[in-house]
């Protein structure tokens, strides 16, 4: 997983918003 600030990239739950598998 990578940090992603793009709301469209919010694919995985995590402790911070914007956690993405993109």
Curated annotation (Swiss-Prot):
Pathway listed: Secondary metabolite metabolism; methylglyoxal degradation; (R)-lactate from methylglyoxal: step 1/2
Enzyme Commission number: 4.4.1.5
Active site positions: 12 (proton donor/acceptor)
Signal peptide segment: none
UniProt catalytic activity: (R)-S-lactoylglutathione = methylglyoxal + glutathione
Cofactor(s) the record lists: Zn(2+)
Enzyme's top EC category: lyase
Region (Disordered) residue spans: 1-22
Keyword field: Lyase, Metal-binding, Zinc
Any GO molecular function: metal ion binding
Cofactor annotation comment: Binds 1 zinc ion per subunit.
Keyword Metal-binding part of the UniProt annotation: yes
Something else known: On the 2D-gel the determined pI of this protein is: 5.7, its MW is: 35.1 kDa.
Function of the molecule: Catalyzes the conversion of hemimercaptal, formed from methylglyoxal and glutathione, to S-lactoylglutathione.
Annotated family: Belongs to the glyoxalase I family.
Protein name as it appears in the record: Putative lactoylglutathione lyase
Organism: Pinus strobus
Origin organism lineage: Eukaryota, Viridiplantae, Streptophyta, Embryophyta, Tracheophyta
């Amino acid at each position: 997983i990578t940090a992603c600030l793009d709301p469209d990239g919010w694919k995985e739950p995590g402790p911070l918003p914007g956690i993405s598998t993109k």
